[in-house]
Swiss-Prot record:
Disulfide cross-links: 104-201
SUPFAM superfamilies membership: Adenine nucleotide alpha hydrolases-like
GO biological process terms held by the UniProt record: tRNA wobble position uridine thiolation
Record flagged with keyword tRNA-binding: yes
The protein's name: tRNA-specific 2-thiouridylase MnmA
Source organism of the structure: Buchnera aphidicola subsp. Cinara cedri (strain Cc)
Site entry: Interaction with tRNA: 130, 349
Stretches the record annotates as Interaction with tRNA: 151-153, 314-315
Amino acid sequence: MVKIMKKKKIIVAMSGGVDSSVSAWLLLKQGYQVEGLFMKNWDEDDSNDYCSSKIDFNDVKKVCKTLNIPLHTINFSEEYWENVFLNFLKEHKKGNTPNPDILCNKIIKFNICLKFSLKYLKSDYFATGHYAKIKKTKKNFYLYRAHDKKKDQSYFLYTLKSKILSKIIFPLAYFKKKKIRKIAKKIKLSVYKKKDSTGICFIQPKKFNSFLKQYIPQKIGKILTMSKEFLGLHLGYEFYTIGQRKGLNIGGKKKKKNAYPWYVVKKDIYLNIIFVVQGLRNPYLLSYGFLTKKIHYINDNIFYFKKKCVVQIKYRQEPIICEFFKISKKNNYIKVIFKKPILYVTPGQSAVFYLKNKCLGGSIIKKNIPYLP
């Protein structure tokens, strides 16, 4: 009697975008049993003006109908609120600029949602439309940059461990974005023209401040130069980030005959003061390193690679060579020094370390080390 091999079942996290939609099609083409899962992390009843989940869900339904695959839905809005959004607010109140998408990947998407797929939907693997690669050795699974370096999203995935990576598939690992859109058009997916999502996973960047004001009260404070010259008033330090230019409302202010734009360089959260400097290349905007406390390793201890390692402190930023130094056993601080000073090192953001295209792990920036004191 011929033994029939059962198809591997893969649950694809469907966002309503072109990437996750084509990911599902690619897996179908490879012969897997594919089912879609729409994950809702935000209740639009709380904020109709900001959340697009209704539109996204309708797009997912259309795609699943076209592909003829089952669609599951799950609401993780309570888990998201407790584990991601409250942390997001807490960090803003500390004067930091957090990245909730990274925390969402760690706690919601590749933890709670992954476990739900494996346990309750009986899947063998969990797939998403991220641009990243997973490579396997005899002992471990490793995270690498995607073939499309412009779209690479490994920066947002550095918190994942080898055990988690063993259950994940990234179908777009070796594809360029242009190719994905061409495929979507060719197979007549309704989302082939849909714009890529930007900003936080539940809100568009243009509406960010008005959204944040619902949860953090405005507190009028001073905008000062580094020499303590008064330039104007701001709405509260929580609404500004290091390197910010827009929204300061001091564009017409000129110091001497210098008409360069102003940038946020420092925040005093106790006195509610925003400090600004003029000019994109102002040395006050530069840092030669940062302090962090805990580094997450995907597999290998980063200190083994400290002379070869590069660090990326923002999404799509050019990585820079760095070195590591343990400077205090008491508070466990680690100092990371760049080969050359760089702009806008922002507390609360993630610093992700690479060995060539291999993602080693990362950490949260606790404090920048300014080029000028």
